[in-house]
């Protein structure tokens, strides 16, 4: 994949030591542009967000925004082994303020996927004055349930030694794809070829040791505009509902995309549309058109009318079969 002329900036941070931030957009032309801060999921890195931003549905947003893609320590392509104590999710989240300080950004739209969404949540809860709005894709706000806990306990015995066992790879695939998917093997091969498995195991351990957010997320994010996103086939669908249940319904919108597990890959146009709506509600990207508005009712009214149901379900179209030659 093309690096899209990304600029990599090293940021000194208290908990992570250093963070590699990949800037997508021209910082020299930042006047009037919206800053969007991103944090990726386990089993990927900043490139997952670069792919999303490069999707045609994001073209107008890309012109009006600058993206700061934060790479979790040790998750860069072909990274050297990470030595020392790996930061907690709280620690990574707290260090995001150092990223904004480095770029002299007072506040930003914060956007996370999976574990990255959990990290964004922690950042927003600790630094609400640095946030204009948050986008949380497949966000888990609770600790592991009893069944998941038992599986994670066994898995951690090997992960603590920086070993990605077959069970750990299976867990990662289920986390990413939910059920069966034709993309699983392709994803696994790319993952093993690019990411350092020892470092990947450390990020995974940090996630399995996450602390609960659900009891305080509602009060700490009471004034923050939030968009929660999930696919109906996502493995953590129920935890997204739990997160939504804990949040201020007047400030939070839930988007459920039917028949997909990985929203960023399988339904980028739906995600882009909802991102634009959130940004408009936060007073930014006002000049950006909303793709597909003429074909589909969107979330704009639900952002203003707290009494209406907050769930928006989007069904992917069934494409006709390709005719044989």
Swiss-Prot record:
SUPFAM superfamilies: alpha/beta-Hydrolases
Region (Disordered), start-end ranges: 296-325
Pfam entry (one): Ndr
Gene Ontology terms: cellular component: cytoplasm
One annotated GO biological process: signal transduction
Family classification: Belongs to the NDRG family.
Protein name: Uncharacterized protein ZK1073.1
Species this chain originates from: Caenorhabditis elegans
Classification of source organism: Eukaryota, Metazoa, Ecdysozoa, Nematoda, Chromadorea
């Amino acid at each position: 994949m093309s690096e899209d002329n990304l600029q990599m900036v090293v940021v000194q941070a208290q908990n992570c030591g250093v963070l590699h931030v990949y800037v997508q957009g021209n910082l020299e032309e930042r006047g009037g542009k919206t800053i969007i801060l991103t944090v990726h999921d386990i089993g990927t890195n900043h490139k997952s967000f670069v792919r999303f931003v490069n999707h045609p549905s994001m073209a107008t947003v890309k012109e009006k925004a600058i993206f700061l893609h934060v790479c979790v320590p040790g998750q860069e392509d072909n990274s050297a082994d990470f030595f020392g104590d790996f930061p907690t999710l709280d620690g990574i989240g707290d260090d995001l303020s150092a990223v904004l300080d480095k770029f002299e950004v007072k506040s930003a739209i914060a956007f996370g996927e999976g574990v990255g969404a959990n990290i964004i949540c922690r950042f927003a809860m600790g630094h609400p004055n640095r946030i204009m709005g948050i986008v949380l894709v497949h966000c888990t706000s609770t600790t592991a349930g009893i069944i998941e806990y038992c599986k994670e306990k066994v898995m951690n015995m090997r992960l603590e030694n920086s070993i990605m066992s077959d069970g750990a790879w299976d867990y990662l695939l289920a986390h990413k794809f939910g059920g069966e998917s034709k993309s699983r093997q392709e994803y696994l091969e790319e993952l093993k070829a690019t990411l350092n498995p020892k470092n990947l195991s450390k990020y995974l351990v940090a996630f399995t040791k996450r602390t609960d957010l659900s009891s305080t997320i509602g009060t700490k994010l009471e004034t923050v505009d939030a968009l929660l996103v999930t696919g109906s086939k996502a493995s953590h669908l129920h935890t997204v509902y739990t997160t939504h249940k804990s949040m201020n319904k007047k400030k939070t919108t839930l988007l459920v995309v039917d028949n997909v597990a990985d929203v960023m890959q399988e339904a980028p146009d739906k995600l882009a549309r909802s991102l634009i709506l959130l940004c408009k509600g936060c007073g930014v990207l006002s000049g950006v058109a909303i793709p597909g508005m003429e074909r589909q009712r969107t979330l704009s009214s639900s952002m203003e009318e707290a009494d209406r149901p907050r769930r928006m379900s989007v069904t992917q179209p069934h494409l006709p079969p390709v005719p044989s030659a």
